[in-house]
């Protein structure tokens, strides 16, 4: 059973302004957690030597890498393989992804093969109402036409941005939920979004955590906060979640 109290982590994109991975690891631990989902701003997928240094930096700091992404997959097996190779060496099995509509079927067949080969899961990240993978209809279609290794990386705030309900998504896609970005927005009258401490915006955090606890989850569960005050805000996000567990 997934223990969110202990296994909650942080999406490294939240700390994209910090380029030194040792400092990122230290900041993660200062937030009261010891897990991270690595974004491309903190790893070079074309440089295996630097990748090993990244992995060792987090290992030495006692910070577990629970996933990577969001990576942009293509209809190109060699290109996509780089991500799975890194994930295997990093000791995680979640490669959150996105891809373009052109050639999507071939991209997914390649991804399924790589998941099987590497023992990975590739959850699709929903990125708001303007993104073609940001609505439940297309996600349901894709899940019905792919192997179970293809799932959902639920970004709760971007789900809200699409006019959808992350609580219902958590329930509907429970069996394919392999990643979650706990994130919250407030919306102004024109629909412009601002990151806020989770639970202080449009997200029904108590209902989400109840649905999450009922799901058979075993993946990468992280807080993501994209505001410039992330170092100050994320400890409050951690506390907000832990108060309700």
What positions do the PLM features span?
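Active-site acidic/histidine proton-transfer and metal-coordination neighborhood
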Residues: 19-22, 26, 35, 57-152, ...
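Short, acidic/turn-prone active-site loops that include or flank metal/cofactor-
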Residues: 41-42, 128, 182-184
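Metal-dependent catalytic neighborhoods of phosphoester/phosphodiester hydrolases
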Residues: 46-52, 77-80, 232-233
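Short glycine-rich, flexible loops that bind phosphorylated cofactors or substrates
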Residues: 45, 104, 189
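Histidine-acidic metal/acid-base catalytic patches
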Residues: 1-9, 14-34, 77, 91, ...
